[in-house]
Each structure stands twice: as structure tokens, then as C-alpha cells.
Design a protein with these regions (language model features):
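Noncatalytic luminal/extracellular "stalk/propeptide" segments of secretory-pathway proteins
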Residues: 14, 19-125, 132
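N-terminal capping segment at the start of a domain
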Residues: 2-35, 166-172, 176, 239, ...
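His/Asp/Glu-rich mid-to-C-terminal helical/loop segments that flank catalytic regions of hydrolases
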Residues: 262, 266, 273, 377-437
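Structural recognition of the beta-strand scaffold that forms the well-ordered cores
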Residues: 23, 57, 105, 125-129, ...
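Second-shell loop/turn segments in exported
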Residues: 4-11, 26-35, 105, 130-139, ...
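Soluble metallo-hydrolase cores and metallopeptidase-like ectodomains found primarily
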Residues: 76-78, 82-115, 171-247, 259-274
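Catalytic-core environment of secreted peptidases
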Residues: 12-36, 45-54, 120, 124-131, ...
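Metal-dependent peptidase/peptidase-like ectodomains
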Residues: 190, 227-229, 242, 280-381
Length: 437
């Protein structure tokens, strides 16, 4: 057995992987600015302190915390009914008494749906469905929200697309004066807000009040130098949403990189490159934590990162995909690692602004995201950002499989002579992400 196979075997059989995953789920949803997030951060600190031979640091930054005080959507008219809902992060507060208006049901809420409705949207409440989060034709809820604002909507409702009383949540507003009130609904709530049989529009009242305060947030960093000056960056976010346990998204990724670091720690000093692990927070708030961190790196520090491997939602389906961020050379590298370990990966080339790898790619650093269930809308991955994102959705075998696959990429990058893949210039990177900023 060669050293790589021994490493992967040790990770597969490590009981600490499942222990850490369960412990992270025990902390709750880890919504930023809450006790749940703080408990998770302290847990990760404790686990990192147990690993010998690593350097530990913290990247501390100020940000404005937002929390929900009032959170209500009501169907108006005969048989008035209050619906299960969840205000979306940074929703604008409604005026006293709430925002009342007619509801325009835009179906999936893709650009063509907005253009078809046109002026009907102005001054009314736009209702759209949440897309399956990872697919070739996925439109992010933030784009739908921006279109709602562009077409003059007074409010925005995002509904989960399938039955089950699963309320949708997520980040969409920008904390700017142009924001509009926004809330997530369940499929069943949206069904009550569709166009009436006589062709009239349903009416609803949105009531949202948030609380805002400035706090400090913390990215946790751990690193082990290798023989050379370059680094392999391994990242995952530990924050989440407060509807459930944020198990798939992203206790899976955080537990995985803990185990990879634990297993590789004694081996990295003999590798060509060092290993730097980052546990990011505020990922669910527009990728803020990694944005701040990567932007604060010097040009030399960014050029010293050979590749970023980002783990986010690595269970929920047995099938794994690599989002290669438009770095075409990464595709052959991914295929090569897959061939070495006997595992196929679906490769998705277009840049995706859906996790922390994006902030590396936009600064010229080759970056990939490992994710389960791409283009599998019937998989358990579709339950992220809902009350059903709980630990039972991540079978042990899938979590182990995702962790071992990630470790294979990291091991290859640590030991590969010469560049992993070329970096991009600032101009090339800007062109790559044009339209996503």
C-alpha cells in the first residue's frame, strides 16, 4: 500500500469524522451572530488545539449582524390566514402595520418570467419558487430578488418548490436603501397566493422587522508548512441557517476538513507544499468571510496558493461534482485524480458564485468546489436551506466518500512537482467573473 492509499484508508476508517459531524450538528443551525455559531466556533478551536504540529490563527473582522424580530406573512381576504415563513437575510423592514399588496405569481422566477409579467409587477409583491440549488440552469434567489427590484416590486416572496411544509430561507438583500421586504415560504403557502380562479390577484401582508448591530466575526485558520513556499488551501464554512442543523450545508464540509487536517498533519512537512485550512463564517451572508480574507492577502500571498479546494455540501447524494470556476486546466487535473483513486467526478466549468471558492477564483487563484448532487433535484441536497437539513440526510458512507475524495485532491496538490495549474492575471480573473459581481 502506498502512502496515499494509507492516508485515504485512515480517513475512511476514522471515527472522529462522524463524531465531529454529529457534534457540529448538535450546535444547531449556526446562524451568524447567534450563540449557536459561537458554540460551533469554540468547538472547532478545541479540535484544532488537539492536533499537534499545526500553527493556528484567527482572522477577525467587523460586520453588521442582522436578526429577525418580526416575521409574518398573511393571506388577506376571506379566511385570512397567517403562513409559515422566514424573513430572508437583510430583508428591508416593513412599515408599521406591514406591507400589503397584490401578489404576482412568477412561477420559477427566471428572467423570462419577469419580462413576461412586465409592468404588472410594479408596486406589487413578486412570488417566485426557489430553484434546486445546484444545476446547470439554476438561477440563484439573489438574481430573482434583483429582478424583482428592477421591475419595481414592492416585496419579494421565495417559496420552496415542492410539498412538505418546508419553508425556504437564505440571503438575498444587500443591506442598502433600495432593498425591499423579503420572506421565504413553503410550497403550500405559495399555493394560497396564486392567481384566483376568476383571474384576480391574491393579496398578502408582509411584516418584517430586523435588528442590526455591529459585531466581530472570526475565520479560523490552521497551517502546516511544507518543504516549499507554496500552499494548498482547503476551505469550508461553518456558519449556517437557523431552521435546522445545517447538516449538509455545511457540517459535512467542516467535519471533513478537520479529519483531513488531523490525518495529514504529521505528513505535510515532507510534502512539496504546505497545507492551510480555513474555516469561514458569514458564507451564508454573501460569502463575506472569505471575501474579506482573500482580499486582504497580498499579491505575493495569493500567488503562493497553488490551488483552493473548497468543501461545501459533500453529502446528500453519492455523486460528486467539481465546480472548476472556469479554470480549464483544473479539469484535466480533476480527471487525473479521479482516475488514480477510481472515482469519477462530474466537472462543471462555468464560474459559480455559490460558495467560498468563488472568492479565490475571482482573484486569480485556481479554485474548485466539491459538491454532492449536482443536477439531481430529487436528491437530499435539495433540502438545504430548509427545516429538513438535518444529520439524517447525510449517510455515513456519503460523508466518508466525500471526505476521502477531497483528501485525494489535497494529497495530489501537496505532492505534485511543479505548478498544479496556472494562475490568472487580474484582468483574466475579472473577465472570468464578469456578470457575477
Amino acid at each position: 500500500m502506498d502512502k496515499r492509499d494509507a492516508v485515504l484508508g485512515a480517513i475512511w476508517s476514522a471515527p472522529e469524522l462522524i463524531r465531529d459531524f454529529q457534534a457540529l450538528c448538535d450546535t444547531g443551525g449556526r446562524f451568524c451572530g447567534t450563540e449557536s455559531e459561537a458554540i460551533a466556533r469554540d468547538f472547532l478551536r478545541e479540535r484544532l488545539a488537539e492536533i499537534p504540529g499545526i500553527g493556528r490563527g484567527e482572522y477577525v473582522f467587523d460586520y453588521e449582524v442582522w436578526g429577525r424580530k418580526t416575521n409574518r406573512v398573511t393571506v388577506l381576504g376571506k379566511g385570512e390566514k397567517t403562513l409559515p415563513c422566514h424573513a430572508l437575510i437583510w430583508s428591508k423592514d416593513t412599515p408599521p402595520g406591514g406591507l400589503e399588496g397584490e401578489v404576482v405569481d412568477l412561477g420559477r422566477g427566471h428572467r423570462a418570467d419577469f419580462e413576461s409579467a412586465g409592468e404588472l409587477i410594479r408596486g406589487r409583491i413578486a412570488l417566485v419558487r426557489q430553484d434546486y440549488p445546484f444545476g446547470a440552469d439554476t438561477v440563484h434567489r439573489m438574481m430573482k430578488y434583483r429582478w424583482a427590484r428592477e421591475f419595481g416590486a414592492a416585496g419579494y416572496l421565495l417559496a420552496y418548490p415542492a410539498p412538505g411544509q418546508l419553508v425556504a430561507t437564505g440571503y438575498c438583500a444587500l443591506n442598502i436603501p433600495e432593498d425591499i421586504p423579503a420572506a421565504g415560504l413553503a410550497y403550500e403557502g405559495a399555493a394560497l397566493l396564486g392567481r384566483r380562479p376568476d383571474g384576480s390577484l391574491a393579496r398578502a401582508r408582509i411584516e418584517v422587522e430586523g435588528e442590526r448591530r455591529t459585531e466581530k466575526s472570526v475565520n479560523l485558520i490552521a497551517e502546516i508548512p511544507g518543504k516549499g513556499p507554496e500552499w494548498v488551501s482547503l476551505t469550508a464554512h461553518y456558519d449556517g441557517h437557523d431552521l435546522a442543523e445545517s447538516a449538509l450545508d455545511n457540517a459535512t464540509g467542516a467535519a471533513a476538513i478537520l479529519q483531513i487536517l488531523r490525518t495529514l498533519a504529521p505528513l505535510v512537512p515532507d510534502c512539496e507544499r504546505g497545507l492551510r485550512v480555513s474555516f469561514y463564517t458569514t458564507e451564508e451572508w454573501g460569502l463575506l468571510g472569505s471575501y474579506r480574507y482573500v482580499n486582504d492577502l497580498t499579491e505575493a500571498e495569493r500567488r503562493a496558493i497553488a490551488v483552493n479546494v473548497n468543501l461545501d455540501t459533500i453529502a446528500g447524494s453519492p455523486n460528486l461534482a467539481c465546480l472548476t470556476s472556469g479554470y480549464v486546466e483544473l479539469e484535466d487535473w480533476v480527471r487525473g485524480v479521479g482516475a488514480e483513486i477510481g472515482q469519477g467526478f462530474r466537472i462543471i466549468r462555468p464560474p459559480k458564485r455559490n460558495s467560498d471558492h468563488y472568492n479565490y477564483a475571482r482573484r486569480g487563484i485556481p479554485a474548485m468546489r466539491l459538491v454532492a448532487g449536482f443536477d439531481e433535484p430529487d436528491s437530499r441536497v435539495g433540502l438545504i436551506l430548509t427545516p429538513a437539513d438535518t444529520r439524517d440526510k447525510a449517510p455515513v458512507g456519503e460523508l466518508k466518500n466525500g471526505t476521502v475524495a477531497a483528501a485525494a485532491f489535497v494529497w495530489k496538490a501537496l505532492n505534485q512537482p511543479g505548478p498544479v495549474v496556472p494562475h490568472k492575471t487580474d484582468e483574466e480573473a475579472a473577465e472570468l467573473v464578469a456578470g457575477l459581481e
